[in-house]
Amino acid sequence: DNSYKVSGGLHGVGVSVVNALSEKLELTIHRAGKIHEQEYRHGDSQYPLKVVGDTNRTGTRVRFWPSAETFSQTIFNVDILARRLRELSFLNAGVRIVLRDERINAEHVFDYEGGLSEFVKYINEGKTHLNDIFHFTAAQADNGITVEVALQWNDSYQENVRCFTNNIPQKDGGTHLAGFRAALTRGLNNYMDSENILKKEKVAVSGDDAREGLTAIVSVKVPDPKFSSQTKEKLVSSEVKTAVEQAMNKAFSEYLLENPQAAKAIAGKIIDAARARDAARKAREMTRRKSALDIAGLPGKLADCQEKDPALSELYLVEGDSAGGSAKQGRNRKMQAILPLKGKILNVERARFDRMISSAEVGTLITALGCGIGREEYNPDKLRYHKIII
């Protein structure tokens, strides 16, 4: 009775569209002890649904051949199929999905007993994690909504939260993401307040700080979901936010209390993120400028060019003052600027903002380029040189 309690498809549009765009579509349905069959050509039924045999199985098989008249190519990309089927296997613990590519006689089997925990483990492979995976499922009897969440922090600086409703991904998030974020931030703030961490460290943390390095999967099963569009890229069911927030609040608060070591490691990362954010703010202030570059404020020795059009300007980054001197003598002053950089430059891909900003050479480079840094301030249109030669 509960087989179709929740569904990704809402109106049957999917199979109708596939049917219309297929040269041929075959339906084989095992139900109530009988095998039913029907065939379509370019969306038109070839005969009514008919019984073709007996069965003790249940289920539906859909086979379709994309129309060459509609599509310029009808070759399936096995990587795209594998990615989606792996995702479905993670989202439905214990379901075994087999993908066969008969073109090259290859088979992929997706079977994950751990469900969302294994999903997080798969995403975090190769990264250093700060805590064991936190995973819970909570079903609400009054509205039929089931909330499942798995999460883990790692040593990266990116947030990776993926949201699903009835197995369908929402790349734009929605009410389930809002509920998750609210509960996560509240739970961590309450923990750090109770442990006096914020007063001790003298920092103010934000939700973004809490989610730095976080990998999380938020999956909800909703009987009657509402989306912002047919593509289902954003969930708008208001009751889901409350359901996720309540379930996450309870389970996550308990997790932090029961795992003090993990809680301290997570709090430490959040404090570091808050400090880095503050350093980034200072960096943005440093690189803000109303018009031309204030050369007097540069810690380096930029020899600027006369050209004011960035499209015609070149910046040469050279190592040390001696190379800088030679470059200045040989340059075309009209369009070529020279910036000597001393010492070994910092690998900013692996360094935090606070470390990056403490490097005088990096600071010089940021100011000379003029396009700013950070999510809010970076503007490539303000780049002062369209050619940069290292």
Swiss-Prot record:
The record lists the catalysed reaction(s) as: ATP-dependent breakage, passage and rejoining of double-stranded DNA
In the Enzyme Commission scheme, what number(s) does this protein have? Answer: 5.6.2.2
Nucleotide-binding as UniProt keyword: yes
PROSITE patterns registered for this protein in UniProt: TOPOISOMERASE_II, TOPRIM
Q: Which residues form the Toprim domain?
A: 313-390
Q: Which domain of life is it from?
A: Bacteria
Q: What is this protein called?
A: DNA gyrase subunit B
Q: What gene name does this entry carry?
A: gyrB
Biological source species: Acinetobacter lwoffii
Say which enzyme class the record assigns: isomerase
Chain's role = A type II topoisomerase that negatively supercoils closed circular double-stranded (ds) DNA in an ATP-dependent manner to modulate DNA topology and maintain chromosomes in an underwound state. Negative supercoiling favors strand separation, and DNA replication, transcription, recombination and repair, all of which involve strand separation. Also able to catalyze the interconversion of other topological isomers of dsDNA rings, including catenanes and knotted rings. Type II topoisomerases break and join 2 DNA strands simultaneously in an ATP-dependent manner.
Complexes and interactors: Heterotetramer, composed of two GyrA and two GyrB chains. In the heterotetramer, GyrA contains the active site tyrosine that forms a transient covalent intermediate with DNA, while GyrB binds cofactors and catalyzes ATP hydrolysis.
Q: Which GO terms describe its biological process?
A: DNA topological change
- What more is known? Few gyrases are as efficient as E.coli at forming negative supercoils. Not all organisms have 2 type II topoisomerases; in organisms with a single type II topoisomerase this enzyme also has to decatenate newly replicated chromosomes.
